[in-house]
C-alpha cells in the first residue's frame, strides 16, 4: 500500500466508501485492529472521512494510537455498540463478522447505529453449504472463522432493513480443499432502509 498499489481488500473498501457518495462522512470502523484502514481511506479515498476506530482489543488500539497520533478510538463490542441510534453516517464492519458467533447481533447493532450506510468488509462466502464455523489458530490464540452462506447472509441483511446495493470482490480466499466448494470474499455496501 505504501508503494502506491492497493491490495484487493483495500481497493474494495475504498470503492465501497466511494459508492456511498457521501462528502466528509463520519466513518466508524468496528473491529479496526491497528486502524490501518484509516491510512487506506486517507490516501486513496475520493473524499475526506472523519474516522473513529472501535475494537475490543486494547493492545490493538494502543498500536493504532502510536501509529496514528490523534486518532479517535474506543474500546467496545460489535454486539453492543456504544453509540446512539442513527448517529453514524457509515458503519464499517472491518473484516469482523467472520470472527463473531454473535454475528447476527453485530449486524443488528450496525444497522441500529447507522444513519445511512453499513459496509460489511471482506466477508467469506459459500453458495451451497450452510454457514460453516471453522476453528484455527490465529492472532496467537484459538480463533473461529465463519464462512457465510450467501443466501442466509442476505436474509439477515433484509431482516435488519439493510438493502445490499453492491457486493464488491475482495481478497481471493478459496477454501474448496477444506469445505468442498469454492469460496470468495465480498465487501457488502448496504443502505439503511426506514
Feature roles, as predicted:
Residues 92:
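A conserved beta-strand element that flanks and buttresses the S-adenosyl-L-methionine
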Residues 95-99:
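Short catalytic micro-motifs in class I SAM-dependent methyltransferases
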Residues 1-21, 24-33, 40, 119-147:
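Conserved class I S-adenosyl-L-methionine
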Residues 104-117:
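A short glycine-rich, Lys/Arg-flanked "PGG" loop and its adjoining helix->strand segment in the class I
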